[in-house]
Regions:
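A positional/architectural concept
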Residues: 31-64
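Hydrophobic faces of well-ordered beta-strands that scaffold small-molecule active sites
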Residues: 45-49, 66-72, 89-93, 117-121, ...
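Phosphate/adenylate-binding glycine loop and adjacent helical scaffold
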Residues: 3-29, 33, 64, 74-76, ...
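Catalytic cores of alpha/beta
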Residues: 73, 78-83, 126-140
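Glycine/Thr-rich beta-alpha phosphate-binding loop at enzyme active sites
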Residues: 65-109
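Non-catalytic positions within long, well-ordered alpha-helices that form the structural scaffold/packing
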Residues: 111-112, 134
Length: 167
């Protein structure tokens, strides 16, 4: 469960999906919508659930062989997913605020666990962060920011061709 401290306050979690996802240089239909905690878990279909709900589902026998997606918030303990990483298809890393860079660290931790599915950025996804998100393994982006959407729709990929000083 996500926890806050005096130094790192909790940010509101992203709990609503966009209708499309930017991946492979274009917007595609969002095939993994976010399911709210109060919503009934569907008997079929692909859904992304909260971190706590995912741990509950993965610990029980409700899923069978079914794979799910999980939202990882800035304060969630990614290591808790280690025993279940092969049962996850999508991990949506929440970026609740521009100034909160913990999602980048979460993506690195996820890669160290050996997760091989789609890593998706959700929340406050802005054009100047996308290249840095790609560098830590994020491959898909739910973009609700109007300016970022316009840039991406126009084919203005933020990835520079030359790095003078890598981050």
């Amino acid at each position: 469960m996500a926890t806050a401290s005096a130094l790192v306050p909790a940010a509101p979690a992203t709990r609503v999906s966009t209708t499309d996802v930017f991946r492979n240089g274009r917007f595609e239909a969002n095939d993994w919508p976010i399911l709210g905690d109060a919503d009934a878990f569907p008997s079929e279909g692909q859904v992304i659930v909260s971190f706590a709900r995912a741990l509950d589902l993965l610990s029980g026998d409700v899923l069978g062989n079914r794979r799910i997606g999980v939202i990882v918030g800035p304060a969630d303990k990614v290591a808790e997913l280690a025993p279940h990483v092969d049962r996850l298809a999508v991990v949506a890393i929440d970026f609740p605020k521009y100034a909160d860079g913990r999602g980048f660290s979460q993506a690195v931790r996820l890669a160290r666990l050996g997760f091989a599915g789609e890593v998706r950025a959700i929340g406050n996804v802005l054009i100047d962060q996308i290249d840095f998100m790609r560098r830590v393994g994020i491959t898909a982006f739910e973009v609700s920011h109007a300016v970022t959407r316009r840039y991406l729709e126009a084919g203005k990929d933020p990835a520079p061709g030359l790095y003078y000083q890598p981050s």
